[in-house]
């Protein structure tokens, strides 16, 4: 009962409604919803082309597609995975956070699966948009303009992708409301055109029998062998993104919309199959290079509308991966697998976020993919390999969630055995894609995982030396320092930003910075912690003075919609304390204003750790720390995250308090003596 109440509360912020369902259709289903554009095309090409199409092939291949979508998307993700949410957030990192206490080694499948999903997400916009734009060639008037010059297709594709990433900053809610009605029309178009051809050849419904798929997989007429599963898998690559996007739309809205989406998808696949059975012997089709049944089965007058609609749907397909990537990186940052990055919340729901750095990196990656592979056939060959790794990792983590958190005994073992075996077949069948382009996503996944490993290991080394000191024990020293005229006053107010939320304790590095690294004399020291709240508009603070008028522990409680302008908020706190007499007036004689007020100057000190050359650490640890600090510099500066760009900020490096290597004692020589 407690578990069910917890789940219900986590999704209460996004109730099921027509509006939310439209957002769900616009944000979540783009990837899986555009699969009909290229799945049947890949199946036909893999079996030897239109000349090798038989009724056995069509029914067998479609049966494999139908049951791939049913088993992986419907059963594994919609019915099982969506139940495993972390305060409403989905995705492999949210799942790991639920089971990490079950074993430290589970961080490995979490990092591998997350890295593979992010890498595959870079390929998705390229392959879907390129496929849609290539559909223009099925329109004679447009083909006369474009011709067979792939460079023009590439240029149009790049323009669309760049615009897609530029509009991310306005938020997924606004994008979803714009895309939702279009995706509804898209799915109705898929279902309607598919149903039209199913009526013409009702025998295609025999593909719903799973025996047809298994029999064809083992049949000598299956020219692709087990590799046919690699093409079938393309029909469900968007399932993992569906799980990752749960925080944007809520589980209930996915439950409400998936039956409609699945029916339309299956009708489209069966409609293409029915058209193939009716036209397999058509000699005119034999001469069409790179035949795509999705476009070819449509009447010539309907193709311009279909190409235009599929282009927009392809853009929305990219959106599903982009929004999922934002959620994944946000979760990874909380788990200390990636650096902290600047995050914006354009909507009223915390799950809808925008991370500029992730957006820019994915944009560059998509552009590279388009320029490297040029056409959709090459991209399809690379597509899907990495995502099979993600699905296997998700299955493993779900096993521990069901077994350890849900306390189920037998069901988790059956679940893991079945889906790991099934996904293992898909992984083996996709391995042939490695040398045809799959290497790119594997290399990207390896790069992303390398960043995670370095950040995770580097953070582990730092945390081993992390120590909190009782702040009250240092009040006498701070009082003496405040009154010690031998040291020049650094500023009226010296401010440190802290990660820890303890009131009575302080990070040793901060105490070391104030007292040991050239004493930082001030009228008052401020230790400020910023906590982002689940409510969007929370705007409050608390202060602990320790009975002094020179040491202040400030907690800022800011809703996720509130800009973190620490300088401005701290000045308000100072004014409040000055008004109550808890802070003595900080008068100063020089100012551009006629009334300088009673608030003095501020100096913000941001701590950065430094590993000294003589530190006694393992070479692997030294490498991890060094690489972490390189990544940290690339990730941006806290001065920008906390709105301190125009403030007086200094970065101070403090050493990691590790053991130091013993050094030999030097021999002292006389002034004129030489060794």
Predicted feature descriptions by range:
Residues 2-675:
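The structured alpha-helical core of multi-pass membrane proteins
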